[in-house]
Design a protein with these regions (language model features):
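Non-transmembrane, aqueous-exposed alpha-helical and coiled segments at domain scale
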Residues: 1-166
Length: 166
């Protein structure tokens, strides 16, 4: 399998290539990340909070939904891209300058993973502590609350984190 093969083109700052190529394959396998019409493998990477904050801002979002939390089950460590470096300079905000973006390296915050199966979990407090910590910190990094988290592929494998949606 070619680590550069992808269903879509474009710059993925946190694609798990090189030293993290194996990790990207695990995420792809666990998340069934293959193109529907072609069956080609999609590139997978850690959550990019820089791009996430930018998306939240330009779309005027006041809350988000996290999907595929179950894909992270079994990983010893989980990373979130919290910034970039470019020519030794720290970048905290997303840039739409394609040249600069293509030269950036991700800066990660690392979390402990969890081993417990979460697909049957129905509440935030039923999640493993490390999964709770991950969701809590994502909300802090993104500066918006997470209202819903999916813990599996089925409709009922969803946790409502905000009572307004319960």
């Amino acid at each position: 399998e070619n680590p550069d093969e992808s269903v879509t083109e474009g710059d993925l700052k946190n694609a798990n290539n090189g030293d993290e190529y194996y990790q990207g394959r695990v995420l792809r396998k666990n998340g069934y990340e293959y193109g529907t019409p072609t069956g080609r493998a999609r590139r997978c990477g850690w959550f990019d909070a820089v791009a996430g904050r930018y998306s939240i801002t330009i779309n005027g979002l006041d809350a988000i939904i996290i999907t595929k939390l179950d894909v992270l089950t079994g990983l010893k460590k989980i990373k979130v891209c919290i910034g970039y470096t470019h020519n030794g300079q720290s970048i905290k905000d997303f840039t739409n300058d394609i040249k600069i973006l293509s030269e950036c390296k991700p800066v990660y915050e690392e979390f402990d993973g969890w081993e417990e199966e979460i697909r049957n979990v129905k509440s935030y407090h039923g999640l493993p502590k490390n999964a709770q910590n991950y969701l809590r910190r994502l909300g802090e990094i993104l500066s918006v609350p997470i209202y819903i988290a999916s813990v599996g592929a089925e409709r009922d494998e969803t946790i409502i984190l905000d009572e307004r949606f319960g």
